[in-house]
Amino acid sequence: MKKVCFIVAMQGEAKPLIRHFGLHHIEGCFGSLPPQAYRASYAEKEIFLVTNGIEQETGLDYIGCEAAVLSAHLAVSSFSPDLIINAGTAGDFVSKGAEIGDVYLSNKYVVFHDRRVPIPGWDKMGQGYLPCVDPLNIISEINVKSGVCTSGSSLDITGDDLEQMKQTGGEVKDMEAGAVAWVASLYNIPLLCVKAITDLVDAGHSTPEQFNDNFLLATQRLDDVCFRLIDEKLVDKL
């Protein structure tokens, strides 16, 4: 496995990775499109990182599935990676044993929790069930958890979303993994999602408040795991 590409939504999540791996910005890599690309040779590998970019009107990071699809497609078509790592923050549940700052690796498949198409065939297509690599060989080495990543287009969650998560087994709730997984599946490129928990859905506290309060801690934990995946050559065991 020579080429690894990180797909990261937010610049705040990406900056420690850029510093650690000595990644250099590739100016104008995608023309006028928002995603930004970085590259370096590190530990006998080519490391790439693509962020969703900044929306000009607000100055904020692009988030969500649409931005993630664009970033993932541009990354794959430009760099042809051997492995995609979708690194970011996510929510989870106290009832499932999660705590703030826990890091999860995707397991089994990646799904969507807010796509409801009750027509045979399209129902499963909408939910996704997109492939990801089996992380069980490395979980014990880096003291992380594993779970099914599930994506939606909102930071909060509805009762219908929760019901679909029960049906699919989704647990680690974010806004990008499903989109990246879809692109990876089209190109038949192995995918690993690495998600650090910023908020607990059933903790009784506001999701935006939890996200803002815990983003720094979660990002530190996230990046530490991503460092180890490369530095300790754990990606070669996937």
Predicted regions and their residues:
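Glycine-rich beta-alpha junction loops
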Residues: 10, 91, 109, 153, ...
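Short, well-ordered amphipathic alpha-helical segments that serve as non-catalytic structural scaffolds
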Residues: 71-75, 131-135, 218-229
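Active-site rim beta-loop-alpha module in soluble metabolic enzymes
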Residues: 118-174, 178-187
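Conserved active-site and cofactor/substrate-binding residues in soluble primary-metabolism enzymes
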Residues: 12, 63-70, 79, 175-178, ...
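Metabolite-binding pocket within alpha/beta catalytic cores that recognizes anionic/polar moieties
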Residues: 1-129
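Short, well-ordered secondary-structure micro-motifs
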Residues: 17, 96-97, 116, 159-162, ...
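Active-site-adjacent mobile loop/cap segments within catalytic or ligand-binding domains
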Residues: 164-169, 173, 178-216
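His/Asp/Glu-rich mid-to-C-terminal helical/loop segments that flank catalytic regions of hydrolases
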Residues: 201-238
